[in-house]
UniProtKB/Swiss-Prot annotation:
Gene name, Swiss-Prot/TrEMBL: rbsA1
Residues reported to bind ATP: G40, E41, N42, G43, A44, G45, K46, S47
UniProt family annotation: Belongs to the ABC transporter superfamily. Ribose importer (TC 3.A.1.2.1) family.
Catalytic activity: D-ribose(out) + ATP + H2O = D-ribose(in) + ADP + phosphate + H(+)
Compositional bias segments (type: Basic and acidic residues): 499-522
Assembly, per entry: The complex is composed of an ATP-binding protein (RbsA), two transmembrane proteins (RbsC) and a solute-binding protein (RbsB).
Ranges of residues in domain ABC transporter: 8-243, 249-496
Organism the protein comes from: Streptomyces avermitilis (strain ATCC 31267 / DSM 46492 / JCM 5070 / NBRC 14893 / NCIMB 12804 / NRRL 8165 / MA-4680)
Function recorded in the entry: Part of the ABC transporter complex RbsABC involved in ribose import. Responsible for energy coupling to the transport system.
Region (Disordered): 492-522
Primary localization class, coarse: membrane
InterPro entries for the chain: AAA+_ATPase, ABC_carbohydrate_import_ATPase, ABC_transporter-like_ATP-bd, ABC_transporter-like_CS, P-loop_NTPase
Protein name: Ribose import ATP-binding protein RbsA 1
SMART domains: AAA
A molecular-function term among this protein's GO annotations: ABC-type D-ribose transporter activity
Length: 522
C-alpha cells in the first residue's frame, strides 16, 4: 500500500500527568479504507491517545502526521478541520435539540442571515439515509434509543467530511442485532475510503470487522498484528503474559445451603422460582433477555417486591421487600448498572467502600473514620484497585477498578451470599480474570455466589451449576461437566419448568435436553 493511502501517523507520542506516564512512545498509523483496532486493558492509554487526536490533550513529545504533513492539534476545531471525528461512549449530543440541529450544531446552513431549516433538515435526512437509520431529522434526541443515538453521532461525523473516524467501544451497550447493523455501516464507510480507529473489548469483533490491530500496554505500543491473529495471542499481548485458562475456576467442596429460594413468584414477571446456593459454590444463571433473571435476584435482595414464596439465608427466613433485612442476613448485590446503582460516582474510593458498613461503624452518632479508612485501605489493597489514593473519585477509575470497588464494599460487610449481575460487562480481559480470581477467593472463604451473565462462556467457565431461566421460570439445571452452549440455549428457548431435587446434593442431570441451538455469546 502506497504512502498516498496513509491518512494518519503517530510517532513516539508521549504524555505525562503528575506522577503518571500515560503514554510512553506510542506508534500508530491508519490507512484509507481500513478498520484499525486499538486494543488494550483499561488504563493502558487508549483514552489518552484518543483525547490527543480529538484536541482535548496536547502531547509532551512525538509527532502527529495527517496525510504526510506534521500537524498540531490544539483543540476540537483543529481536529475537525483535519477531518478527524471522534464518537465517545458517552455521546456528545444535546437532548432537547432535534436530530438535524445536533448534526449541524454550530454549522447550521444559513440563507439571508437566518438558519435555513429546510436545507438543514434535507441534508440531515441524506446523512441519516447514508447510515441506514430511519429517524426524522425533526425528532428530539431525547426520544431516541442508544442505537439510534449512535447512528446520529456517525451522521454528524460524516457531515464534517471526516476522513478519520474514531469509535470508542461502540458496541458496549448494543444488542447483537444492533451490533450487526453497526458493522454493516462501518464496512460501508470502509468501502467509501474512510479510515476507522475501532476500540473494543470484544475479541470476537476483531476478526469480524478489523484489518489490523495495534495493542497498547502500560502506555506503550507493544505490537501491531493482523486482525486474524488468534485470541490467545491478542490476550498475551494485552496483559503481558499467557493466560492458560481464561476462566480459572477453583472448585472447593461445597457446604450447607446458604441461600434457599422457594416458590418465589411475582405475578406477571416470574413464577415458582426455587433453587439453592451452597457455601463455596458458584451458581450461574443463564437465559435470554427478558427471561426474568435480574428481576428474581432483585427480589431476593429485597429491592423489588414478590407476591409468594420465601427467601432464607442459613435457614433463617428473610423478610420480603426489605433491603436492610437482606443485608443484615448477609446478602449482597453487585447490580448490572454499576455506575447508576452500585457507586456514588462523585464520591471517593474510601467513601464508596464504606457505603455498606457506615451504620456498623457509627457509635453514639459518630463515625469511626479511622477504622473505616483502615478497612478501606486493606480491601483496596487486597483487590488490587489501581488508584492514585483512597481520595480519588470513582468516576475517574477504569471500569474494572470501579467493579472491584463495588465488590469491595460487600467484602467489608462480611457478606455470606453475593449476587453478581453481569459482573464483567464492559471491562477488559485482564480485569475480567482478576474478578474471576476474586470469585475464587470468596468461595474458598465459604461464601455462596449467584452469578447472572449474558456471556455464556463466562457462565460455563465459572459456574459449578447453571440454572437456565426462560419466560420467568427456571427451565432446567445443568452441572458443570455437562453444561454447554448448546444445552444451555436449548433450555433458554424451551417452555419447560424445572423443579429442583431436594436431596443434599443437587442432581446435575436434571433439566437435560437433546435439543441443539448454538448461540452467539455476546
Amino acid at each position: 500500500m502506497s504512502n498516498a493511502d496513509e491518512l494518519l501517523r503517530i510517532e513516539g507520542i508521549r504524555k505525562t500527568f503528575p506522577g503518571v506516564v500515560a503514554l510512553d512512545g506510542v506508534d500508530f498509523d491508519l490507512r484509507r479504507g481500513e478498520v484499525h483496532v486499538l486494543l488494550g486493558e483499561n488504563g493502558a492509554g487508549k483514552s489518552t491517545l484518543i483525547k490527543m487526536l480529538s484536541g482535548a490533550y496536547r502531547p509532551d513529545g512525538g509527532r502527529v502526521l495527517v496525510e504526510g504533513e506534521e500537524v498540531r492539534i490544539h483543540g476540537a476545531q483543529d481536529s475537525e478541520a483535519l477531518g478527524i471525528a471522534t464518537i465517545y461512549q458517552e455521546f456528545n449530543l444535546v437532548p432537547d435539540l432535534t436530530v438535524a440541529e445536533n448534526i449541524f450544531l454550530g454549522r447550521q446552513p444559513r440563507r439571508l442571515g437566518l438558519i435555513d431549516r429546510k436545507k438543514m433538515e434535507a441534508d440531515a435526512a441524506e446523512l441519516l439515509a447514508r447510515v441506514g437509520v430511519q429517524v426524522s431529522p425533526r425528532a428530539r434526541v431525547r426520544e431516541l434509543g442508544i442505537a439510534r443515538l449512535q447512528m446520529v453521532e456517525i451522521a454528524k461525523a460524516l457531515s464534517l467530511n471526516a476522513r478519520v473516524l474514531i469509535m470508542d467501544e461502540p458496541t458496549a451497550v448494543l444488542t447483537s442485532e444492533e451490533v450487526e447493523k453497526l458493522f454493516a455501516i462501518v464496512r460501508q464507510l470502509r468501502e467509501d475510503g474512510v479510515g476507522i480507529v475501532f476500540i473494543t473489548h470484544h475479541l470476537e469483533e476483531i476478526a469480524a470487522l478489523g484489518d489490523r490491530v495495534t495493542v497498547i500496554r502500560d502506555g506503550k505500543s507493544v505490537g501491531q498484528v493482523p486482525a486474524s491473529t488468534s485470541e490467545d495471542e491478542l490476550v498475551r499481548l494485552m496483559v503481558g503474559r499467557s493466560i492458560e485458562q481464561q476462566y480459572p475456576r477453583e472448585r472447593p467442596d461445597s457446604g450447607a445451603a446458604l441461600l434457599s429460594v422457594e416458590g418465589l413468584t411475582r405475578d406477571g414477571v416470574f413464577h415458582d422460582v426455587s433453587f439453592e446456593v451452597r457455601a463455596g459454590e458458584v451458581v450461574g444463571v443463564a437465559g435470554l433477555v427478558g427471561a426474568g433473571r435480574t428481576e428474581v435476584v432483585r427480589a431476593v435482595f429485597g429491592a423489588d417486591p414478590y407476591d409468594r414464596g420465601s427467601v432464607q439465608v442459613a435457614g433463617a427466613r428473610v423478610p420480603r421487600h426489605d433491603v436492610s433485612a437482606a443485608m443484615s442476613a448477609g446478602i449482597g448485590l453487585v447490580p448490572e448498572d454499576r455506575k447508576g446503582q452500585g457507586l456514588v460516582l462523585d464520591a471517593s474510593v474510601e467513601e464508596n467502600l464504606g457505603l455498606v458498613t457506615m451504620r456498623a461503624a457509627t457509635r453514639g452518632g459518630l463515625v469511626d473514620l479511622k477504622g473505616q479508612r483502615d478497612a478501606a485501605a486493606r480491601v483496596a489493597g487486597q483487590l488490587g484497585v489501581r488508584m492514585a489514593g483512597l481520595g480519588q473519585h470513582v468516576r475517574t477509575l477504569s471500569g474494572g477498578n470501579q467493579q472491584k470497588v463495588v465488590i469491595g464494599k460487600w467484602l467489608l460487610a462480611d457478606t455470606k451470599v453475593l449476587i453478581l449481575d453481569e459482573p464483567t460487562r464492559g471491562i477488559d480481559v485482564g480485569a475480567k480474570v482478576e474478578i474471576y480470581q476474586l470469585i475464587n477467593e470468596l468461595t474458598a472463604a465459604g461464601a455462596a455466589v449467584l452469578m447472572i451473565s449474558s456471556d455464556l462462556p463466562e457462565v460455563l467457565g465459572m459456574s459449578d451449576r447453571v440454572l437456565v431461566m426462560a419466560q420467568g421460570r427456571i427451565a432446567g439445571e445443568l452441572g458443570a461437566d455437562e453444561a454447554t452452549q448448546d444445552s444451555v440455549m436449548a433450555l433458554a428457548v424451551s417452555t419447560n419448568q424445572y423443579k429442583p431435587d431436594k436431596s443434599d446434593k443437587p442432581d446435575a442431570s436434571a433439566g437435560k435436553t437433546d435439543q441443539k441451538e448454538a448461540p452467539r455469546g455476546h
